[in-house]
């Protein structure tokens, strides 16, 4: 099984940015844990602060990955283009968030939900 972990804007700063909300664990630490727990799963990662690059990565996932784990960062709340890209591909996509977006501002709640298969909230 091959999974693409796709991270959006500012997630390159995970572990250093707004630690009270997002925690102090760097993405590399999460990845090390995931690889230890799921040694038989091929995990590839891609992070971009650019919306179009995330859309391109979603499009390229078809036929290459069995699924995508996607944290769109702030684009979760604003990007219809990313929502449409997820809806346009056959690859299953699971939306994840480090913080509990449902406990935060209303505008953070819904835009990606309609097209993802599942949602995982608050990893901190």
Q: Could you say what each language-model-derived stretch is?
A:
Residues 9-11, 73-76, 99-101:
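Short glycine-rich anion-binding loops that position phosphate/pyrophosphate groups of nucleotides
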Residues 1-4:
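Extreme N-terminal starter segment of soluble prokaryotic enzymes
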Residues 13-28:
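Glycine- and acidic-residue-enriched helix-capping/strand-helix junction motifs
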Residues 87-104:
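Short, acidic/small-residue loops that bind anionic groups at enzyme active sites
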Residues 44-52:
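Short beta->alpha junction loops
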Residues 112-114, 118-124:
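Single conserved hydrophobic/aromatic residue that forms the stacking wall/gate
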